[in-house]
Amino acid sequence: MMVFGIPIDFVLFALTLLGVATIHHHTLKVALIGALVITLYQLVFTGFKTGAGVSGLLGHAGHEWVTLANLLGLLLGFALLANHFERSHLTDKLPHLLPDDWKGGFLLLVIVFVMSAFLDNIAAAMIGGTIASGLFKRRVHIGYIAAIVAASNAGGAGSVVGDTTTTMMWIAGASPLWVLEAYIGGIVALMIFGSIAAMKQHDYQPIQRDDTPGEHVHGVRLGIVAFILLAAIGVNVWFNLNAPDVLGQFPVIGTAVMLAILVTAPIRSPDWSLLPGAFKGSIFLLALVWCASLMPVQHLPAASWPTALGLGFISSVFDNIPLTALAIRQDGYDWGFLAYAVGFGGSMIWFGSSAGVAISSIFPEARSVWAWLKAGWHIAVAYVVGFMVMLAVLGWHPHPINERAAAQPAATAPAR
């Protein structure tokens, strides 16, 4: 069913996002009502991607539960991890470890970029957001928040273990070297959006060298933070290399983070009182992710570099997992370009990637499409420039991809 040529599903999702942006005191209710209305609409009228009726709904839920469970585990886990990190007092020392001008903020974005090559981009973004919150005395410019998300997404775009979309391509038969090309665009984009965002942040709230007298870094809590991060990185890399199918069947990364927190709790207990608030915020975010997963995307234009460029903009609004699955089934892409587009493109709007959705739990003010676009305009510019540099340096060279797993690519990788 259409309204002025637009599927009603999209209209309902747009109304939900409009409600979230305008009814600030009832965002959870708006998100839940939106998710319920879209679900009921597809249940009664259009059916789901996995079929019609209740069986289609159950099939879709079965397909998405790993995504949602991973996100829930990471959101709750990193709320506790952030508290460990804050109580370690390392953020009080960071102003003396980083340059105290705009280059300090830029270096933090580089760190997030590098982390995301090995770590889930949600985790990398939340770590970056936690550090930024302490480093800038909780006064973080929305343009810089957007840059943290962009750095986490760009950092994973060239690694087959750094992003679900690239993992899907790898499982389907793409060479890791094909995907690695995305780092050319990613690094160019980072230089552009990173420097602009860091300068904006420095003008808004500079890094201040003002250690609290007598404070020292609590090594035990910092060690716990490192252990939790290593657990997340370790299981992500190990399963990607040895048993990638498991990642699509069980929320491995979210579970690893929560288990690491429980194992270390007897050594230093986290602030468990944070969980109710974190859970409420997580339900809001999961409702939006569920809505995005329901958006109908049935086919793509012919594979070409303009199509790949356009997919980056599309992925800022719609889930990049089904977009990637469609591209794999379609075949005929230069997979480095596609990895860059669908991996980095979602950074242009706050709900365009799981990293953006997750970081809004730290910075609720980021949940505004207009504020994100206005303050983070440099991300869209950087995306296009990075893509064009790739095109000029590498040229467009489509590779045939092994179709052995393309029939079910989205079911063999964790959601991002």
Model-predicted segments: where are they?
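Interfacial loop-to-helix junctions that mark the boundaries of transmembrane helices
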Residues: 1-5, 22-27, 51-71, 99, ...
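Helix-loop-helix module between adjacent transmembrane segments
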Residues: 78-83, 111-123, 150-159, 185-194, ...
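Transmembrane helical segments that form the transport core of multi-pass membrane transport proteins
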Residues: 228-333, 410-415
